[in-house]
Amino acid sequence: MHAELVLDARNGTGESPVWSVAEQALYWVDIPARRLHRWRPADNAAQSWEAHEMLACIARHPAGGWLAGMESGLFHLRPGDDGRLAATHLADIRHALPEMRCNDGRCDRQGRFWVGSMHQEMAAGHRAGMLYRFVGEAGGAPLLPWLDDLVVPNGLGFSPDGRTMYLSDSHPSVQAIWAFDYDPDDGVPHNRRLFVDMRRHPGRPDGAAVDEDGGYWICANDAGLVHRFSPDGRLDRSLAVPVKKPAMCAFGGPGLDTLFVTSIRPQGVDLSDQPLAGGVFALRPGVRGLEETVFRG
């Protein structure tokens, strides 16, 4: 299957793609550039806005704009005509170490926002990462962690019925994807178990998406692949993209049947074998995805 380049974005770390059904547009972030991007297929128009600090993940906000996991916590971001993102502080995250930030995040099927944190020096392997839940607590109170002892939490996803939560850790020392039983009523994950040992497959587990049949799609960082695992953890197929570091994927397009893939453009390395690194790509895998849930807060 051919991966189509939709935008030669040259993102340092392109992450958190979210399809806006209302706008028929793809949004995503470039973490180190502190930018939110938008691309509309209808007219091939691209636009971006600058944030006040690194932003790592986004979910649609009910008041318009975006709920974003950033360096210091969670913010409500609203794109402005001046090319900047107006930010309203929602919640602090008291990181375990300096130089940490949010990483992967998304809403469950009921609109609760889950987000992980990591140390910015990934190579150090600090097990200081945590997983947090935000349901709109008032007053900007610091979030309390639900899970700790993580290095690079990633791969958050929820089954179509909302009763299974997925989480991965991308660090080379871990490379695991876990599944949890998840109660849609109270939003509490339990019964953590190994879903996929990614050391048995090419690439490290990065960002993910779930299709309407329950297939779990995850970007295989360093391998230039996007894997689909069936709900029982079996590898169903692997699709190639023309870059080594696909970062996250999301279903979009008019029928939610296009799998968009963001990627990473490494610094200080020869990119002659992957000149499109940091681009956004489209795959048509023959399955449909699910619309991302709006934050309920």
Task: List the predicted regions and their residue ranges.
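Beta-rich, blade/repeat-based domains predominating
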Residues: 9-23, 52-69, 96-112, 147-164, ...
